[in-house]
Amino acid sequence: MRGADPNAPWLLYLHGNSATVASRGNVVRYQGLRSLGLNLAAPEYRGFGGVAGQPSENSVTEDARHGYRYLRETLGIPASKIIIFGWSLGSAVAVNLAADVPSAAIVLEGAPASLVAIGEMRYPWIPIRMIMRNPFESALKIGRIDAPMLFLHSPEDKIIPIEEGRKLFEAARDPKQFVEVRGGHIDPADVDASVYFGTVRSFLAEHGLLTRSADGAALKRRDGRW
């Protein structure tokens, strides 16, 4: 989705589990992110949203890589204008991708340090590490990313506890920023929109990724809540 400024940075949006690119939570985020003046691309994973195939850690990462290659090779977008954004499971996919390709900045929302660790916490009587086929060990990979990173996480998150996000933050290289938002795992972009999108706007502006007009623009949604 191109914005009004064709020269604006592109945001590669990677959604979470139990969702599709058309899910309401994703659409709310698209609207707010595009209001910053960004162009946006949101590839769908195989096995999601009617796309054929069986999802796995390797397959969703490859689908994200295909979206990145589309921006670089088909549209000719330089890595210096690509922001990788991941929410929930998509944040783990974003780490996998960003560990291997250059980018301008990374934004992670509700990010787990390790899906194995979350499984072990919830089911301590099961040998999760032995049987889990898609561990998404983000904390072991994030140190390879040298782009600026923003972490958004809610203390009310019952799906990916905020402690997981902090562990991942600690494993990341500088420059990095961790910001708490309200709304649990699903709704920060809705119930805490001004903090959520205002933080993203400030972070991108700090790293030279927003035009002056976008940096100074007031966020406002059609229902008036931004």
Predicted regions: what they are:
Residues M1-Y70, A98:
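Membrane-embedded segments
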Residues Y70-T74, S80-W125:
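Primarily recognizes the serine-hydrolase "nucleophile elbow" in alpha/beta-hydrolase
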